[in-house]
Structure formats: structure tokens, C-alpha cells
């Protein structure tokens, strides 16, 4: 088989399973997640070594990213409460951003595994659901820590008959977050894989560049919505 066709082969729904305590884990997702965490750890180390009062070099870049995340949190959550949520939103944004870009830029397809293929961690629904559930837990924590059990009064405001709708909303938020991210990243990698198989030289390049752009947008959308949900939980309801 043509080597390009082997690289372009798309394996949908196939997984490299690891057995742990009687449970099957998606091994390829854990491998690529560790790669992403390793990249973030290295970048963090480089950005926090030999700090200077007047930043230069890589410190400039890390401070720019930190300011961007801080401004995002401030815009979405508000002046009063945003600082304590900067680490959470920063972690979510950076993990998704690097995960998405790793799928677009790293040559995962050149690495053979016993079954399935390596891809961005966010290409697996388990990863995106976990991130969405963390977001749900965070906004419940935000609301309860500020208002106590009075937080749950929001379910019957402005009228008691809205209770089922308000409860349903808490289930649809993580669903929409997880499926939006998963669908976009999976679709991008499938389109690139098919185009590489059909026209392997030039045509896939613009699609790959578009994928890099949309990958960054998806990380921003996820972090922005997470901040908006936290702000909603913290806000006073009347």
C-alpha cells in the first residue's frame, strides 16, 4: 500500500485498550494526554525559569498568555470574583488548546499502535465529557460556596413551573460543551484524512491551516462558556 494512503487511513471507533483493575481504558487517549501535559509542563518550566522584572524572551510569551486568560476570566466572571477562577479557566483553555493543536501539528499518524491510531485527546468523547463535567462541578461549587443551599432557589425563579426546564438546562450544558468540542475536532481530522487519501499533495494544506485556526477557536469557546456558566452561578437572581 502507498505509504501516504497508510498515513491517511482513518480509524473511527477503534481503540487501543489497556486493562486496569478489570476496566478497559482508551490507551491512545492516555498517551496523547500525557504528551500534552508534558508539553505544558516544559513550556511552564521554560517560562518560569530566571524570571526578570523586565520580561524578555519566552517570559514575554508566558506573561502574554497569562494576561489573556486573566482578561478572559475578568470579562466572563466579573471584577469581584474572577481572580480565584483564573487557574481553572487557564487550565481548561491551555489543555484544550494544546490538545487540539497537537492533533493538527504533531505526526501522530506516523506512530503505529496495535489498534486504532493516535490523535488529539479531544478527538475522544471521554475526554470532552470529562472536561464538561469538571466545568459543571465548578459552577455548582461556585454557586454553593457563595450562596449555600440558597443557590438551588434559582431553579424555581422566576416561577416554580420553570423547575423542570431549569433542571434540564444543567444537563444540556455539559452535553453541548462536550459534543461541540468533540464533533469539531473529530470532523476536522476526518476531513484532513480523507483529503490526504484523495489528493495527498496540495489540497489538504488549506484545510489543515483552517483546522489549526478552528482548534484555537474551540478552546476559546469552551473556556468562555465555562466562565459564563460560573458567572451565572455566582450572579444574584431576582
UniProtKB/Swiss-Prot annotation:
Changing residue 231 to G: In strain: CC-503. Its main location: plastid. Signal peptide: none annotated. The chain crosses the membrane at residues 27-47, 86-106, 125-145, 190-210, 211-231. GO terms for molecular function: proton-transporting ATP synthase activity, rotational mechanism. InterPro entries: ATP_syn_F0_a_bact/chloroplast, ATP_synth_F0_asu, ATP_synth_F0_asu_AS, F0_ATP_A_sf. It is a multi-pass membrane protein. It is found in: Plastid, Chloroplast thylakoid membrane. SUPFAM superfamilies: F1F0 ATP synthase subunit A (SSF81336). One of its GO terms (cellular component) is chloroplast thylakoid membrane. Keywords: ATP synthesis, CF(0), Chloroplast, Hydrogen ion transport, Ion transport, Membrane, Plastid, Thylakoid, Transmembrane, Transmembrane helix, Transport. F(1)F(0) ATP synthase produces ATP from ADP in the presence of a proton or sodium gradient. F-type ATPases consist of two structural domains, F(1) containing the extramembraneous catalytic core and F(0) containing the membrane proton channel, linked together by a central stalk and a peripheral stalk. During catalysis, ATP synthesis in the catalytic domain of F(1) is coupled via a rotary mechanism of the central stalk subunits to proton translocation. Belongs to the ATPase A chain family. In plastids the F-type ATPase is also known as CF(1)CF(0). F-type ATPases have 2 components, F(1) - the catalytic core - and F(0) - the membrane proton channel. F(1) has five subunits: alpha(3), beta(3), gamma(1), delta(1), epsilon(1). F(0) has four main subunits: a(1), b(1), b'(1) and c(10-14). The alpha and beta chains form an alternating ring which encloses part of the gamma chain. F(1) is attached to F(0) by a central stalk formed by the gamma and epsilon chains, while a peripheral stalk is formed by the delta, b and b' chains. This is ATP synthase subunit a, chloroplastic. It comes from Chlamydomonas reinhardtii. The lineage of its organism: Eukaryota, Viridiplantae, Chlorophyta, core chlorophytes, Chlorophyceae. The gene is atpI.
